[in-house]
Amino acid sequence: MSDSNSTFKDLGVAKWLAEALNSMKITQPTTIQKACIPEILAGRDCIGGAKTGSGKTIAFAAPMLTKWSADPCGMFGIVLTPTRELAMQIAEQFTALGSVMNIRVALVVGGEDIVSQALELQRKPHFIIATPGRLAHHIMHSGEDTIGGLKRVRYLVLDEADILLTDTFSDALATCVQILPPKEKRQNLLFTATMTDQVLALKDAPPTSGKPPLFSFHVENLDDLAVPASLQTTYLLVPEHVKEAYLYQVLSSEEYKSKSAIVFVNRTISAEILRRMLMQLEIRVTSLHSQMPQRERTNSLQRFRANAARVLIATDVASRGLDIPAVQLVVNYDIPANPDTYIHRAGRTARAGRGGEALSFIAPKDVSRIQAIEERIGKKMDEFTKVGDTALIRKSLNKVTVAKRESLMAMDKEGFGERRKTQRSKGKQTKSLHS
């Protein structure tokens, strides 16, 4: 690996790109960048592992852009990622880095107009940043003039590869990959924050004939996924029927009323109920979940980044990768089934040595999950004592109950949830057509 004082130019990055990075105040390569950039430039397939915020995007973007600038023609590379927000963020970075070279970047994600995307693909963008489901839709339904360029791409990147290699994405991913050049004729780059069995299986696969050996690198202690030492991990035993009242009491308490927070839930309907309820209770709140139209999701993120909202209610779409400023409090309103998900959520606070707190609401059914999390992070959670006065909870319970009831009535009137049923129905019909 390159020495600790390496510059991007030392790593082999094109002069124009090193200057572009410098203008963005990115001057010192991170560990993952120093390890992977020279190897990718040398033509090796790569598996790179590092925690969120370690610079993984530039680790694959810099060598791809360097090679592209030497021969800037046609569709050059595809980056697949599991969420729309991550895709948008990566597309923004590619566009910013390549703007001096007139780069063309296409964003192909759900929630946006399909016809406009098809027209954009026909214009042969240099790089396509996509979610697998939407790109697979174009491959199955668009003409050769739209997707023909995919057959000649030189790079395939799977970002957040551990998620993309799960069953959730397997069908769409297979559709995307089958139209690309065979693996012998393209470079395959996988980046992840978690080394799962599926990722390790690819690492240990037999070498591809005619290609240099696979390069695999992960930043030390990645597999430990240890939570930062500056993070307080706390729990609060909360009866299920008064969880909303406890959440309101925490967020509006003297201790937390001016602090930024992300509240993680397991279901989209919970995110929507809590957003509406807290808004009625005059807390500056926004939300992020898969049932929101794309424009609303983008606006919601922008509001939270700009501190127009101090509380973000989110499903796990917000736990990884997204460029969200570090917050002071993470609340696990619902406990995740996977301990690693807890770690990714908690990673939204206590960054860069700063303090932070991850508070988990625990109902009796969650005890086994908490034990698994404590075993995974190697430490016991402390009991949360800052808020929890039962008299105060009882006092706020009535207005919280009213706010929740009014929120549910409004959602029912608007048909919230019907959209999801329609989407599921369409998905089943589409799947049956292609089965």
From Swiss-Prot:
SUPFAM superfamilies: P-loop containing nucleoside triphosphate hydrolases. A motif (DEAD box) lies at residues 159-162. The Q motif is unique to and characteristic of the DEAD box family of RNA helicases and controls ATP binding and hydrolysis. GO terms for molecular function: ATP binding; ATP hydrolysis activity; RNA binding; RNA helicase activity. A motif (Q motif) lies at residues 6-34. Belongs to the DEAD box helicase family. DDX49/DBP8 subfamily. The keyword Aminoacyl-tRNA synthetase does not apply. Pfam families: DEAD, Helicase_C. It comes from the Eukaryota. One of its GO terms (cellular component) is nucleus. ATP-binding RNA helicase involved in 40S ribosomal subunit biogenesis and is required for the normal formation of 18S rRNAs through pre-rRNA processing at A0, A1 and A2 sites. Required for vegetative growth. It catalyses: ATP + H2O = ADP + phosphate + H(+). This is ATP-dependent RNA helicase DBP8. Residues 421-435 have a biased composition (Basic residues). It is found in: Nucleus, Nucleolus. Its main location: nucleus. SMART domains: DEXDc, HELICc. One of its GO terms (biological process) is rRNA processing. Keywords: ATP-binding, Helicase, Hydrolase, Nucleotide-binding, Nucleus, Ribosome biogenesis, RNA-binding, rRNA processing. Residues 411-420 have a biased composition (Basic and acidic residues). Residues 246-393 form the Helicase C-terminal domain. The gene is DBP8. Its EC number is 3.6.4.13. PANTHER family: ATP-DEPENDENT RNA HELICASE (PTHR47959:SF24), ATP-DEPENDENT RNA HELICASE RHLE-RELATED (PTHR47959). Residues 37-213 form the Helicase ATP-binding domain. Residues 411-435 are annotated as: Disordered.
